[in-house]
Swiss-Prot record:
Domain of life: Eukaryota
Annotated source species: Arabidopsis thaliana
Oligomeric and partner information: Homodimer.
Any one cellular-component term (Gene Ontology): apoplast
Signal peptide (from-to): 1-19
Identification of the protein by name: Dirigent protein 15
GO BP term (any one): phenylpropanoid biosynthetic process
Disulfide bridge partners, by residue number: none
Functional summary from the UniProt entry: Dirigent proteins impart stereoselectivity on the phenoxy radical-coupling reaction, yielding optically active lignans from two molecules of coniferyl alcohol in the biosynthesis of lignans, flavonolignans, and alkaloids and thus plays a central role in plant secondary metabolism.
Keyword tags: Apoplast, Glycoprotein, Secreted, Signal
Cell compartments where the protein resides: Secreted, Extracellular space, Apoplast
InterPro entries: Allene_oxi_cyc_Dirigent, Dirigent
Annotated glycosylation sites: N63, N128
Length: 190
């Protein structure tokens, strides 16, 4: 009888422990966040499609747009590893890189728009090891003033970031698609 009780309690305890560990979530607790901060950062993104060492490469292209005169024809998907610099000059101090993808999302070049996801990572200076993530529609043809793209996250010093980036085309070569863009980021973070 004694051994039967021991086995019974062992089985009950095992089942209770197993039931506890089958849950895929933990307890929900109220979050205590630090005070929210706002940081403004200006840098330049160099997007190069041409030459021996491009930083943006087409990885997919729809057959129906094969005859497009644009270097970034409708339906083209690009992967990027663009340098971020302090100034607009090609040899300006590099402070990071933007890695991600963009797709040409507009048939009409006069309304040229890309949809992009990128992680803008800082590799030097005060924000070394931190990044901001953008995921947004970028209406490139709307050059009156500045375009605005959304900041949807971040890491490091920009953990839980949100905000926006004002984008202004500093220089563009319409034949090659090469561009230098000024990014003025307003980042809300904790």
């Amino acid at each position: 009888m004694k051994s039967t009780l021991i086995i019974f309690f062992t089985l009950c305890l095992s089942m209770a422990v197993m039931a506890r560990h089958e849950s895929y979530y933990g307890n929900t607790k109220p979050a205590k966040l630090n005070e929210e901060k706002v940081t403004r950062v200006r840098f330049y993104l160099h997007d190069t499609l041409s030459g021996q060492n491009p930083t943006a490469v087409r990885i997919a292209h729809a057959n129906l747009t094969g005859g497009s005169a644009s270097p970034v024809g409708f339906g083209s998907l690009f992967v990027i590893d663009d340098p971020l610099t302090v100034g607009p000059e090609k040899h300006s101090k590099e402070i990071g890189n933007g890695q991600g993808m963009y797709v040409s999302g507009c048939k009409d070049l006069s309304k040229f728009t890309i949809v992009m996801y990128a992680d803008l990572a800082f590799t030097a200076g005060k924000f070394n090891g931190s990044s901001i993530s953008i995921f947004s529609r970028n209406p490139v043809a709307e050059e009156v003033g500045e375009r605005e793209i959304a900041i949807v996250g971040g890491r490091g010093k920009f953990r839980m970031a949100r905000g926006f980036v004002k984008v202004k085309t500093n220089k563009i070569d319409m034949k090659t698609g090469d561009a230098v863009l000024r990014y003025d980021a307003t980042v809300y973070h904790y």
